[in-house]
């Protein structure tokens, strides 16, 4: 097994750990989930480039008669990338004392101001930064509003 294979195993393990955390661990942290809203995905061009480069590496490894384990590891990495970028749905998870946004816990007390932009983006102003929350379904913003009013 080469260093390349070890690095590929490390990247696959990191992506797998992220996927498990995102799907199974995060919804169970900090109490029961009150509301989970699917969000719009960010630009997919990055994911196309990533998976495309992995496919090029697989092709290059096969045509140069590279190690079979490397081909399988590259294929597993491409599948993990495909899952993370295209199948997994990003979401905001509301709990009793805060919410998870982009896998980061934010308490309700950190919210200084909230606005709704004209194009349906919920803007939350925190102490140091601004969160731009783009929901998939515009009707979900009413659910978020009702939840925030009831918890505050």
Swiss-Prot record:
Q: Topology relative to the membrane, per the entry?
A: Multi-pass membrane protein
Q: Which organism is it from?
A: Escherichia coli O1:K1 / APEC
Q: Which InterPro entries did the record assign? A: DUF986
Q: What is its subcellular localisation? A: Cell inner membrane
The cross-references to Pfam families, in alphabetical order and at most eight, read:
DUF986
Q: Which GO terms describe its cellular component?
A: plasma membrane
State the family named in the UniProt similarity comment for this chain.
Belongs to the UPF0266 family.
The protein here is known as: UPF0266 membrane protein YobD
Give the transmembrane region(s): 6-26, 45-65, 67-87
Name the keywords, alphabetized: Cell inner membrane, Cell membrane, Membrane, Transmembrane, Transmembrane helix
